[in-house]
């Protein structure tokens, strides 16, 4: 089968897949959606992603202990990018805060059903002392919160030679490749720049630099 257009807007390669014979196709009269279209977001996955979030949002914490929220980002094709908020209860008596429990939660997420198709998982812990409530659906604020606290020598966790989405061709073989978990928690380590520094603007190799966040 293949090549065919996939849910991320690309074309898959040819592979051997099970043969399915279709004898009848049923359709509801006056259907709201007579058909769906796959391709770059927002397409089919957008609507289904929103529906799944509304149906399963409250049940996620019951399925995965310690998990407060998880959001599949539509702009990334829904399942390739997950943003999650967990709990940090392992060492509350220590002054130094660092990822611990959220690492076990990350493993649970990547081992659960369709969540296992994620390519990138950003996860932090609920912060009750923060002036605002962290929300996985407010993507820009979520990224800014994590990047301000991330230790890049410690908080990048690569999963190599593992199972990945069939439509992910970044690996060496079909269904085999890598994933990345970014787990950050604790005190602020840096203040993110709101403007592009002059040191970057004046580089010979760079012509136009714009800041999109924060």
Predicted regions and their residues:
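Charged, compositionally biased interaction regions
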Residues: 1-214
